[in-house]
Regions:
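Conserved catalytic or regulatory cores that recognize and/or transform ribose-phosphate-containing ligands
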Residues: 2-130
Length: 130
């Protein structure tokens, strides 16, 4: 399962044997495009299910209630990242200013940052999220 995730953080060397291995029990924050994506809850839910099946505790910003300002969401999400062991970026993370900020913040505070491989995300989610 580890082959479906590659490390994108250049700040710290990858701990490949530990990153997203089954049974590692990491606290994982999921980042990706929410604003402007009508199916964001489904997309984040699939990622959460897959990571939970791998034994991780998932911090999912798509579960936050609607009705707040972007700045409020970012403060909450940064706090969630503070609690996380690593951040997983969904393939569309570059399309989101919020996800780009989350990546930069996570790297700044020394968190591992990994990205789900675009070419294999569906296969990854199908195999792990059964």
């Amino acid at each position: 399962m580890i082959e479906y995730i590659r490390v994108v953080s250049k700040q710290r060397p990858a701990k490949r044997a530990f990153d997203m291995q089954v049974g590692a029990h990491l606290r994982v924050y999921v980042a990706g495009k929410i604003t402007g994506d009508a199916n964001y809850r489904e997309k984040f839910s699939k990622a959460e299910q897959a990571l939970t099946a791998m034994g991780h505790c998932v911090l999912n910003p798509a579960n936050l209630p609607s009705g707040m300002e972007q700045g409020d969401y970012m403060r909450i999400c940064f706090s969630m990242i503070d609690c996380a062991d690593c951040v997983v970026l969904l393939p569309d993370w570059r399309e989101s200013s919020g996800a780009r900020l989350e990546r930069a913040y996570a790297e700044k505070i020394g968190k591992e940052v990994v990205v789900a491989d675009q070419g294999r995300i569906d296969e990854f989610l199908e195999k792990v999220g059964r």
